[in-house]
């Protein structure tokens, strides 16, 4: 694979979206995506599974907006499950981060119970 150097990169601070007239009504816009064959989101947003980003509060907020929050794994298993339950109590979709070790397989099994 040939790596081509990036000549220009932009961040959010480098771009401004200027509103303009449009014939399209907000009620006519569909931002939904099929994340998987059986999982559709109203908005194409998944929160990052980082300890400074997603616990139950963020997962609930993004879930209410139509996306999905992914609870990070930098918690002990029971605390991660508690965060997941807080989101599920709101009847929202939620994801959970797990690693690839045997211990993380046990984490995944505990989360799925």
Model-derived features: where do they sit?
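Alpha/beta enzyme core
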Residues: 2-5, 15, 53-113
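An N-cap/entry alpha-helix motif that binds or orients negatively charged groups
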Residues: 1-45
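Acidic/glycine-rich phosphate/pyrophosphate-binding loops and surrounding catalytic core
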Residues: 34, 50, 61
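Extracellular/luminal Protease-associated
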Residues: 44-52
């Amino acid at each position: 694979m040939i790596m081509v150097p990036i000549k220009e990169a932009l961040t959010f601070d480098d771009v401004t979206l200027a509103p303009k007239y449009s014939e399209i009504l907000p009620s006519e816009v569909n931002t939904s995506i099929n994340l998987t064959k059986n999982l559709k989101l109203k908005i194409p947003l998944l929160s990052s599974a980082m300890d400074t980003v997603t616990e139950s509060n963020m997962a609930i907020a993004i879930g209410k907006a139509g996306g999905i929050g992914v609870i990070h794994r930098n918690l002990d298993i029971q605390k991660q499950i508690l965060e997941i339950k807080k989101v599920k109590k709101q009847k929202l979709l939620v994801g959970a981060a797990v690693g690839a070790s045997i211990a993380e397989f046990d984490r995944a099994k505990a989360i799925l119970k």
